[in-house]
Amino acid sequence: MKNIELKKFFNEDDSFEQNGKMIYLVPLKEFMKTEEFASFSPVSRKDKNETTGETSITKCQFLNSSAWTDVHPHMIIDKTKSEKTIKYVDLGEKAVGGEFPNIEYEIMVRVNEDGTLNRDFVREVKKGRFKNKEGKFVDTWYYKKGYEHFCPVEYPRYYRDPSF
């Protein structure tokens, strides 16, 4: 699907003006059908099965960041070849149903008037490392400012604990 076709999802209630241009929120599931989304490079996530010892590799296009009791979704838009540094944009959310505390959310993407991804707030995060017992460096997930943990996922989720 071409990005311009996202215009059918534009809604004045889900839009705002920023630096003289309109920004629209469209559902992530629709943005994932575009050619632009298909051009983003995924990040590899290695998972080791502790019982069998086998390692599986999953290609991930999203990050879930967790800090305290909140999980926030992000979309990966670029990476270095070694995947030590990745660039991402934050995804928004919109309440679409349910009642407190069981509110249902839909994940939204910020796009420009022509349907292309809004890149005004591209952020960067680096892979964390630690030394194991043998003195070798082991890469872990991604960290920012030492407290926010970023985990690559196939599809993002949103969660906020209202009791915190």
What is each model feature region?
Residues 2-73, 89-164:
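Mixed-charge, low-complexity intrinsically disordered regions
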